[in-house]
Regions:
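Long, hydrophobic alpha-helical segments that serve as membrane-spanning/inserting helices
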Residues: 1-19, 26, 30, 34, ...
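Elongated alpha-helical scaffolds
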Residues: 95-99, 242-250, 616
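Alpha-helical transmembrane segments and their membrane-interface boundaries
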Residues: 1-120, 125-161, 332-490, 498-517, ...
Length: 717
């Protein structure tokens, strides 16, 4: 009993992270106390906080490279503030250029975006403490010392648990997969009637979250594969990742319109049986995620075999009672798909399953990292236009920080640089995220000040305040990604305690509230009036990218029905791109729900388009999940023509409407009249073609409703 408990907490990354933060804060507070110079606590702690906020997962060589880049950026940002601080005009110019430059650097990838944010944070932390030291280099070096201290702890943790972040990402992937399967199971609820589109909307949003987690896992895998491709631990996680991708394709598959199933089988238990089976598979994915975290073997639930047996019996009973043969065949395809998911889960721990595929292409991952200066320039140049969200964010942040700095210079506020700090954290690249953070930041600050003042009064001792500083710092990082208001409250307490070490705790408390309100107001004005997102939303272009990706996915599947099934890199890229574009569309439509200047008609059309696109992708996924080489030339010919028709129907000009309609009618007749072998995958292929082309007229109508002509889209930058 003791061993599992110890394992649970020893291998719990969250607790290990909290311990690392605790040790780091103990170091930044205990050393100054031991030296008798508590003023050192402020730059050391702030440097450590900035380093923790920019912590990046990578292999050892990558972490060392990230550390060097981070320290260089931190020193440049901090030293620039110290050197330019006496000259306001030069300082404002430097603030503008550095802010826009650092943010645009994020166009090179998430690593550089994170480091750039940390550099801006260090710059503002330096502004808060410019009066602490006489020489310009003292505070920058102390801030760097705090950053180095935290990174030393991080490197130590990496040496002890090198694969831990990768396993965390992999476990989160299976948790998100479980969530997706659970939501998918709700589509089999026979009591859904009027709100039949709501579960599809939730499913599309969940798919976006799952794809984001899978993409993050892929990045973690790539960093490890560059250095230790042959190691068993990395090979094992790579196998788990490929299984997650395959389960996702099967889980996202749709074999019929769910409303048709619900209407026909409303008073039968078969819908509940399928719902329970998918719910059990969701629980199995959750259990697998837990096993990955605890590094214990996954044991597949033996009850699955009984569940499959009972579903087979239920389908046979319905077949004997004269139920629709077409619908029963569809349920049979669905059951085959769910059996394949079960087989993946049941054999995931098998040594044979974890062996490398013979085809090297099936073991490769798409590498999206930088490749040479031409690639660097290409990625940067893409963001030199207002069409880029990153460019708009860079311009907004530059103006926000300059306005805040100008306000400080005009009013002479002593601690006014908290305005800049608030704006940096609150002002996000899009309107919805900024609005959400704005309210939480204000609430957290008000509560933090209300709690902080009595604490400063009742805990006057230096040692007591240092202990509280450590506690509030740990709690800030604990709540940072789950409860932003709580995190703001604790960071407010930390700041009050830091300045109280200089005897200024009571003096800065109320100004902190005012600065927060001003910083939030500036951030809100920026996202509302400086190139607001809804003017650049361009739903037609996002939809165009989604339909293009679906067409490429269909092409990749078509190739495998001709040549045979495999998991080559090109196929997996096409599949991932289709789901990523579906996730992008879900994000845009979700943001539209709370943006101003969106008519109810546009919002409803966008919502319906999202549901249709996700359904369309799920029909394609079903073709992909069941892909195998076919020999019937009539079925292959129909599939070839259907793929060409889908591409044509989604990209045609208005004057071609009649031709496209005639082609649709011709395909429908071929689908209805084609003879197929019932003991093969041919009926499923024909069925999925029918489902795909049935959606195209409504998709086309909604496309025309929200889109300019195709020629306009092509000429736009």
């Amino acid at each position: 009993m003791l061993s599992p408990l110890i394992r649970r907490y020893t291998w719990n990354s969250t607790w290990l992270y909290y311990i690392r933060i605790f040790i780091a804060l103990c170091g930044t507070t205990a050393l100054p106390w031991w030296l008798g110079d508590v003023k050192l606590t402020i730059p050391l702690t702030l440097g450590m906080v900035a380093a923790a906020l920019t912590d990046l997962d990578d292999r050892l060589a990558g972490r060392l490279r990230n550390l060097i880049i981070t320290l260089i950026c931190f020193f440049i940002a901090s030293a620039s503030v110290e050197l330019l601080f006496p000259w306001p005009w030069l300082f404002a110019l430097g603030l503008t250029l550095s802010t826009s430059g650092f943010i645009l650097l994020g166009g090179l990838g998430q690593r550089y975006a994170t480091i750039a944010f940390g550099a801006l944070l260090i710059a503002i932390y330096t502004m808060l403490g410019t009066s602490l030291y006489d020489h310009w280099y003292q505070q920058p070096l102390l801030l760097l010392a705090g950053a180095v201290w935290y990174n030393l702890l991080t490197l130590t943790g990496h040496l002890l648990f090198p694969l831990r972040p990768l396993q965390d990402n992999l476990a989160r992937s299976y948790e998100q997969l479980a969530h997706y399967l659970e939501l998918k199971s709700r589509l089999f609820d026979p009591d859904i009637e009027d709100e039949s589109q709501a579960p599809l909307y939730d499913l599309a949003l969940a798919n976006g979250q799952l794809m984001a987690t899978l993409n993050q896992t892929k990045v973690s895998l790539l960093t490890r594969l560059r250095g230790d491709r042959g190691q068993r631990g990395t090979r094992r996680t790579l196998h788990y990742y490929f299984v997650a991708q395959d389960i996702h394709e099967r889980a996202s598959s749709s074999h019929i319109q769910y409303q048709t199933l619900r209407d026909y089988f409303r008073h039968s238990d078969v819908m509940f049986r399928f719902q329970r089976l998918m719910s059990m598979q969701a629980q199995a994915c959750t259990q697998l995620a837990r096993c990955i975290l605890l590094r214990t073997p996954y044991q597949h639930d033996p009850r699955f075999e009984r569940v499959f047996t009972h579903i087979d019996a239920a389908l046979e009973r319905m077949r004997a009672s004269g139920a629709s043969l077409e619908l029963l065949n569809t349920l049979g395809f669905l059951l085959t798909n769910l059996r394949a998911i079960d087989a993946q889960l049941a054999t995931i721990e098998s040594e044979q399953a974890q062996a490398m595929p013979r085809n090297e292409s099936e073991n490769q991952l798409a590498d999206d990292s930088l490749h040479g200066f031409s690639d660097i320039w290409l990625r940067l140049s893409r963001n030199f236009t207002p069409e880029s969200a990153l460019f708009r964010h860079a311009v907004r942040m530059s103006l926000v920080l300059c306005i805040g700095y100008a306000l400080i210079q005009i009013t002479g506020m002593r601690h006014g640089y908290w305005i800049l700090l608030t704006s940096l954290f609150v002002c996000q690249p899009n309107y919805n995220a900024t609005r959400h953070r704005l309210a939480l930041r204000i609430i957290g600050t008000l509560v933090g000040v209300a709690i902080g003042l009595p604490i400063l009064w009742f805990v006057p001792s230096l040692e007591g305040q240092l202990v509280l500083l450590v506690i509030t710092g740990v709690l800030f990082f604990a709540f940072r990604n789950v409860q932003y208001a709580h995190a703001t409250m604790f960071i407010t307490l930390l700041v009050l305690l830091c300045f109280n070490l200089l005897g200024e705790g009571f003096e800065v408390a109320l100004p902190r509230v005012g600065d927060t309100l001003i910083g939030c107001a500036i951030a809100w004005a920026a996202v509302s009036f400086i190139w607001p997102d809804w003017r650049f939303r361009n739903l037609p272009r996002v939809l165009q990218r989604a339909t293009d990706a679906n067409c490429r996915y269909l092409d990749a599947i078509l190739e495998q029905y001709h040549q045979g099934r495999d998991n080559r890199l090109a196929y997996r890229i096409a599949r991932r791109d289709a789901h990523n574009r579906d996730a992008e569309l879900a994000s845009v439509v979700s943001n539209m729900s709370s943006e101003p200047d969106v008519t109810a008609e546009t919002r409803e059309a966008a919502f319906r388009l999202l549901c249709l696109n996700h359904t369309f992708t799920s029909y394609i996924s079903a073709l992909g999940a069941h892909r195998e080489k076919l020999s019937n030339p009539d079925v292959l010919g129909l599939l070839d023509d259907a793929v060409c028709y889908v591409d044509d129907a989604l990209h045609h000009q208005p004057e071609d409407e009649q031709r496209v309609h005639q082609a649709l009618e011709g395909l429908k007749q071929r689908v209805q009249s084609l003879e197929t072998r019932p003991d093969s995958k041919e009926p499923l292929v024909v069925q999925q073609i029918g489902l795909l082309i049935a959606l195209l007229p409504e998709i086309g109508r909604l496309q025309r409703q929200i889109s300019p002509p195709i020629s306009t889209l092509i000429t736009q930058p």
